[in-house]
């Protein structure tokens, strides 16, 4: 066997007849499979042991030779070689075809490769191959045209006219084979290149296509006649097995049926040829043989598929590769693994962040070999067999051994669907009773898990390296930040938030207000004994917390705080300021001075002069975690998170918050608000009846009225709510629910959507406290159902989007430290109209500068060129008033097959500079795909007059951008740089004309009458600027402007969609994806290079081809950039393995075989398919074979000294 980790590339070509014979171990002559009485394979049949190898290890068919000692001997009685039975998965046979047969992939594929090679139409080919017409192969001296078709009748007439032997015409695949042998590749190519110089239109397109195929044959060394088969390979029998079922019947792979048909027809043809049967019978048999081989290779590609019992189409060789159940996606990219299990998950509130609870029964099964090894080592059992029995019996001693084995041995937990890399994390197992896996509550957010019956899978990493990677790279405590935006992903939720919210509340006049304590213990004692309340404002000596970063003016004073906040600050890391107010200033700059008593001040007076602070909410806790991570990194943060979780749970239990119907308030003026709305609607309808407004206007006015009524109720609800109301506390803290839920309970439900997505005019006036009427209940069911179906559709759509994104970017890996490019990207804040969707500060964080950034007023250099911009530096740059900065960007990176560290910036998941080997493409794809489910599915119909265009938003818009489709509601763009001089309206054609005066001439643009203008007369516009509202078509923009403009536009558009839904995604992820869409160019004029016009190729390959020509003084080729949608980009990748496993498997493989393509295994997918370690992370060549070295020589202490001390 080839060592899979040793070879560099993999090539696929057409198989020549001699190649097929060299693979084969013998000819299959009979259609029989196995003898139904003896159940032994038949000689010369499809399962013959002589050809394919023995069915039992080290045993020949007749039984003369048994055992391994006869290895390699061929039995003299039955002719079977004594070897392993697994050779039946590797050894191939062959069938000698009695007539040539065309390969359906090359004749039927689009475009037809045979047709292009011979310059014949696919229809003509079909007539010849299936014996409906003759084709002239050699006209000799007759006036017949070569390759012209003749019907049976015409053929006979011509024979009579010119005489026998005066010309050669044949039918069937044999004729095509003869024609293919006559093709002179070099001459044809030269002729076509000459023709291209003058051709245009359809003629040119056809010539380019033909040239492409002929050139592929010429360069790859494949011969065109190999597209016709004279010998058919038979795949190994264990890949098309036959299994006996319980009832004595057999279940066989469909391939066996298909092979049997081929063999039967081939044998019948051989017999007919021997008997010199009439030509028409032979022709018919040849046609049937051709159809049988077609069905074997790709059943159903031509005509009706061959069906098995119950009219089910049989699965051919092509079907074995295609689709989700095909070889690529079912067996090569996703395999089932051993040492795994799955169970329901339950919450484990007492676990540490890096632990998970594993049921004992599960653990003993998963770690069985490890336990057995220890049992033998401890001599509880003599051998492995006895140890296994001991484990299966459930001997008492195994549990102690199991405890030892799992110590320090991490396990992986995975929850499907794994939308991003945090869907698999490592934990240290803790043995528990019961049958459910226990999960730490804080990792739920990363997994998107809840405890309503979710299941999770558990895997055991076996090798030392796998364990080390699990512990160092995948441990849950390491994954504090979300790779998509660099924000903490482990923020506390629900009970934890509520507990900390309640704990940090302040209240005036509670028991114990104004007491002063010397330290925390005293405060807790007073609280426990009922002298002070958690919410009472009290004093505490600052000196009792000496490690906090106090200002000098604050030391040795008394600080006003609450008992709850003393407890809350006790769990904080010591170097963090004492948190008194829930804001960033307190967190970063320290506790405000107003809380400290000056000597001789009365504490009560100070307390009375202070406002009551709001408690710490979910968002504040997130900020605290982010700050902690920034300062102390993972270890301290995960320990702090555990303390925060415990404190939150403890106090939410203690607070005893409950919800009853009495907690839902009644709004006093609800009736008035609703009456006023009714009155307004009546007026609107009256105006409509009088013809003062259109139906569209009326609809908009009515829905607006009800929306305003609901908002008025909401506003009233917020004004009158009691901050101690449990529902308000849950809502305000961010633990559960929002104002919309609250207003449905206490205000009114409002307007509902009808099944067609249009909003119904009749609102639901009741709320859930009052209860809905039957009609209202019925109205509200529409929305509920739509919600359910939308979610289901959205999940599938979002998953497919993620799959396409991963496919297009899976080979983008950080390959080097610095690519040394001199290009950069000029960035400013992303705006949508007047609204800022993404600030400059956020865009700058974690990127490298391309040029130095200067203060706009003083001119001082804020940061030099090629420096990393930290959060603080980004804030400093923006505060200085800088509006645009040139940064290093993935767009402008010059690294081949990936990105360099400087162009990428920091790794958002760690907050440090990205490492070489990081699979940033996959991370980018997951970061964009994972929030896909949170985006809406709707295409908004903006009602009525406002505009007549539908604005696509949410997930459909993201798909539109990444697939580079023509957008809905397309904007008109200008091709001229200049000024808008006139906008004239033409009522007769219902259009407007916009005139733009440029330096070279005037641009005239016709826009629909109803389109909303983005420009006014006198505005200055650049090329590619939108004149009307709507989305710009990126392909059009690429024609008018340059690649970078398109990249910047696409980046901004993606960010607008996500940010408008409140989802934050790092720019760099979008940059990685967009760069992949623009990595190809189309050759326009080949110049002196040997490139073909119209060829699609990588920018880097194109540059290389030109470089050589320029050096030798020739004319370089010209090209234009091409924008491809992600599906197309995935299929155009350099790796045929990756493309074939994505979509259109047969087309990709057909093309790759003709070109003799080489896959250099640069991406992740290709390596997974062939079972090689992926070239990312620790699998990169530079990280393999690293020997650990001590940093400095370790001093060895003399043993005698140690022993002397010990005495």
Curated annotation (Swiss-Prot):
Organism of derivation: Streptococcus pyogenes serotype M3 (strain SSI-1)
Q: Which UniProt keywords apply?
A: DNA-directed RNA polymerase, Magnesium, Metal-binding, Nucleotidyltransferase, Transcription, Transferase, Zinc
**Per the UniProt record, which EC number(s) apply here?**
2.7.7.6
User: What does the sequence similarity comment in the record state about its family?
Assistant: Belongs to the RNA polymerase beta' chain family.
Q: Name one Pfam family in it.
A: RNA_pol_Rpb1_5
One annotated GO molecular function is:
zinc ion binding
Catalyses which reaction(s)? RNA(n) + a ribonucleoside 5'-triphosphate = RNA(n+1) + diphosphate
> Which Gene Ontology terms of cellular component type are present?
DNA-directed RNA polymerase complex
Q: Which residues bind Zn(2+) 1?
A: 60, 62, 75, 78
Report whether Zinc shows up as a keyword of the record.
Answer: yes
Q: According to the record, how does the cofactor bind? A: Binds 1 Mg(2+) ion per subunit. Binds 2 Zn(2+) ions per subunit.
Query: Per its UniProt record, what Gene3D superfamilies does this chain match?
Result: 1.10.132.30, 1.10.150.390, 1.10.1790.20, 1.10.40.90, 2.40.40.20, 2.40.50.100, RNA polymerase II, clamp domain, RNA polymerase Rpb1, domain 3
Question: Where Mg(2+) is bound, by residue?
Answer: 450, 452, 454
Q: What is this protein called?
A: DNA-directed RNA polymerase subunit beta'
> One biological-process term from Gene Ontology?
DNA-templated transcription
Q: State the oligomer form and interacting partners.
A: The RNAP catalytic core consists of 2 alpha, 1 beta, 1 beta' and 1 omega subunit. When a sigma factor is associated with the core the holoenzyme is formed, which can initiate transcription.
Residues that hold Zn(2+) 2 according to the record: 819, 893, 900, 903
Its function, per the record, reads: DNA-dependent RNA polymerase catalyzes the transcription of DNA into RNA using the four ribonucleoside triphosphates as substrates.
Cofactor(s) required for function per UniProt: Mg(2+); Zn(2+)
Say yes or no: keyword Signal present: no
What InterPro entries does the record point to? DNA-dir_RpoC_beta_prime, DNA-dir_RpoC_beta_prime_bact, RNA_pol_asu, RNA_pol_N, RNA_pol_Rpb1_1, RNA_pol_Rpb1_3, RNA_pol_Rpb1_3_sf, RNA_pol_Rpb1_4
């Amino acid at each position: 066997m080839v060592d899979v980790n040793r070879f560099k590339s993999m090539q696929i070509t057409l198989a020549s007849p001699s190649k097929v014979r060299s693979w084969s171990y013998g000819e299959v002559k009979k259609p029989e499979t196995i003898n139904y009485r003896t159940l032994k394979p038949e000689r010369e049949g499809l399962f013959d042991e002589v050809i394919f190898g023995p069915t039992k290890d080290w045993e020949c068919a007749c039984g003369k030779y048994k055992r391994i000692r006869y290895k390699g001997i061929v039995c003299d009685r039955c002719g079977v070689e004594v070897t392993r039975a697994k050779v039946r998965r590797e050894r191939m046979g062959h069938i000698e075809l009695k007539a040539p047969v065309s390969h359906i992939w090359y004749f039927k594929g689009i475009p037809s490769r045979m047709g292009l090679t011979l310059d014949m139409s696919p229809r003509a080919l079909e007539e010849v191959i299936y014996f409906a017409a003759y084709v002239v192969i050699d006209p000799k001296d007759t006036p017949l045209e070569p390759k012209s078709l003749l019907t049976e009748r015409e053929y006979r007439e011509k024979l009579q006219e010119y005489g026998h032997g005066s010309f050669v015409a044949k039918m069937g695949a044999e004729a095509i084979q003869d024609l293919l042998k006559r093709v002179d590749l070099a001459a044809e190519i030269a002729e076509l290149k000459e023709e291209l110089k003058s051709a245009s239109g359809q003629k040119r397109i056809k010539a380019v296509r033909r040239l492409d195929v002929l050139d592929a044959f010429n360069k790859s060394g494949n011969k065109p006649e190999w597209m016709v088969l004279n010998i058919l390979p038979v795949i190994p029998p264990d890949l098309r097995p036959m299994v006996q079922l319980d009832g004595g019947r057999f279940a066989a792979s469909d391939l066996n049926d298909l092979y049997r048909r081929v063999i039967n027809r081939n044998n019948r043809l051989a017999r007919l040829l021997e008997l010199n049967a009439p030509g028409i019978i032979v022709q018919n048999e040849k046609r049937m043989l051709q159809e049988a081989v077609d069905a074997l290779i790709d059943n159903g590609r031509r005509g009706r598929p061959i069906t098995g019992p119950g009219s089910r189409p049989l699965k051919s060789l092509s079907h074995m590769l295609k689709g989700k159940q095909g070889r690529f996606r079912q067996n090569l990219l996703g395999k089932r693994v051993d040492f795994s299990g799955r169970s329901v998950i339950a919450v484990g509130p007492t676990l540490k962040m890096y632990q998970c609870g594993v049921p004992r029964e599960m653990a003993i099964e998963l770690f069985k070999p490890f336990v057995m090894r220890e049992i033998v080592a401890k001599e509880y059992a003599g051998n492995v067999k006895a140890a296994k029995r001991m484990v299966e019996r459930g001997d008492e001693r195994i549990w102690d051994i199991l405890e030892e084995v799992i110590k320090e041995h991490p396990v992986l937990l995975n929850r499907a669907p794994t939308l991003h890399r945090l869907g698999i994390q490592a934990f240290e197992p803790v043995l528990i009773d019961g049958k459910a896996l226990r999960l730490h509550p804080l990792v739920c957010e990363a997994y998107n898990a809840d405890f309503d019956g979710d299941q999770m899978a558990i895997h055991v990493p076996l090798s030392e390296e796998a364990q080390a990677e699990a512990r160092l790279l995948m441990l849950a405590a390491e994954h504090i930040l979300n790779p998509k935006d660099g924000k903490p992903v482990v923020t506390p939720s629900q009970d934890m938030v509520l507990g900390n919210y309640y704990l940090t509340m302040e209240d005036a006049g509670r028991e114990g207000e104004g007491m002063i304590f010397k330290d925390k213990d005293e405060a807790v004692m007073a609280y426990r004994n009922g002298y002070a309340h958690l919410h009472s404002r009290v004093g505490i000596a600052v000196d009792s917390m000496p490690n906090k970063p106090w200002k000098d003016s604050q030391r040795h004073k008394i600080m006003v705080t609450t008992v709850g906040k003393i407890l809350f600050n006790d769990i904080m890391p010591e170097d963090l300021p004492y948190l008194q107010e829930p804001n960033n200033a307190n967190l970063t700059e320290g506790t405000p001075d107003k809380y400290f008593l000056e000597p001789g001040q009365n504490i009560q007076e100070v307390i009375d002069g202070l406002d009551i602070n709001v408690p710490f909410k979910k968002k504040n806790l997130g900020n605290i975690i982010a700050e902690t991570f920034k300062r102390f990194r993972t270890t301290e943060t995960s320990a702090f998170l555990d303390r925060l979780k415990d404190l939150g749970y403890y106090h939410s239990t203690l607070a005893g918050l409950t919800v009853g119907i009495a907690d839902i308030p009644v709004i006093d003026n609800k009736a008035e608000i609703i009456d006023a709305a009714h009155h307004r609607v009546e007026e609107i309808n009256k105006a409509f009846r009088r013809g003062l407004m259109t139906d569209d206007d009326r609809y908009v006015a009515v829905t607006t009225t009800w929306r305003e009524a609901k908002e008025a109720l909401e506003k009233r609800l917020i004004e009158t709510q009691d901050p101690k109301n449990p529902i308000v506390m849950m809502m305000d803290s961010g633990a559960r629910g929002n104002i919309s839920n609250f207003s449905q309970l206490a205000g009114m439900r409002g307007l509902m959507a009808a099944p067609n997505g249009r909003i119904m005019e009749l609102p639901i006036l009741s709320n859930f406290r009052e209860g809905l009427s039957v009609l209202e209940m019925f109205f509200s069911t529409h929305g509920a159902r739509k919600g359910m179906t939308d979610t289901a559709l959205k999940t599938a759509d979002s998953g497919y989007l993620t799959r396409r994104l991963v496919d297009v970017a899976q080979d983008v890996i950080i390959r080097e430290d610095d690519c040394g490019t001199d290009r950069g990207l000029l960035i400013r804040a992303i705006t949508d109209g007047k609204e800022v969707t993404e600030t400059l500060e956020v865009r700058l964080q974690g990127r490298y500068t391309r040029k130095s950034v200067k203060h706009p007023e003083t001119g001082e250099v804020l940061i030099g060129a090629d420096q990393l911009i930290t959060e603080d530096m980004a804030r400093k740059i923006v505060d200085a008033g800088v509006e645009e900065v040139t940064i290093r960007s993935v767009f402008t990176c010059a690294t081949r097959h990936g990105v360099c560290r400087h162009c990428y910036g920091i790794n958002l998941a760690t907050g440090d500079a990205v490492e070489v080997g990081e699979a940033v493409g996959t991370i980018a794809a997951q970061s964009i795909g994972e929030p896909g489910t949170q985006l809406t599915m709707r295409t908004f119909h903006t009602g009525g007059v406002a505009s007549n265009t539908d604005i696509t938003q949410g997930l459909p818009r993201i798909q539109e951008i990444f697939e580079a489709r023509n957008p809905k509601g397309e904007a008109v763009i200008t091709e001229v740089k200049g000024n808008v001089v006139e906008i004239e309206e033409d009522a007769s054609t219902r259009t407007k004309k916009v005139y733009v005066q440029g330096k070279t001439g005037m641009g005239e643009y016709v826009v629909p009458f109803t389109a909303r203008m983005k420009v006014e007369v006198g505005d200055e516009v650049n090329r590619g600027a939108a004149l009307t509202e709507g989305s710009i078509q990126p392909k059009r923009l690429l024609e008018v402007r340059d690649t970078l403009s398109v990249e910047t536009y696409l980046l901004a558009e993606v960010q607008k969609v996500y940010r408008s839904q409140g989802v934050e995604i790092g720019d760099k992820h979008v940059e990685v994806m967009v760069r992949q869409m623009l990595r190809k160019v189309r050759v326009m004029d080949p110049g002196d290079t040997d490139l073909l016009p119209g060829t699609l190729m990588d920018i880097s390959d194109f540059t290389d081809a030109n470089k050589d020509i320029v050096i030798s003084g020739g004319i370089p080729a010209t090209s234009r950039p091409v924008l491809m949608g992600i599906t197309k980009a995935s299929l155009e990748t350099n790796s045929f393995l990756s493309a074939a496993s994505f979509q259109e498997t047969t087309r990709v493989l057909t093309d790759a075989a003709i070109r003799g393509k080489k896959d250099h295994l640069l991406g992740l997918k290709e390596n997974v398919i062939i079972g090689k370690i992926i070239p990312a992370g620790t699998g990169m060549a530079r990280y393999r074979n690293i020997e650990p070295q001590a940093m400095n020589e370790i001093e060895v202490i003399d043993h005698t000294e140690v022993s002397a001390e010990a005495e």
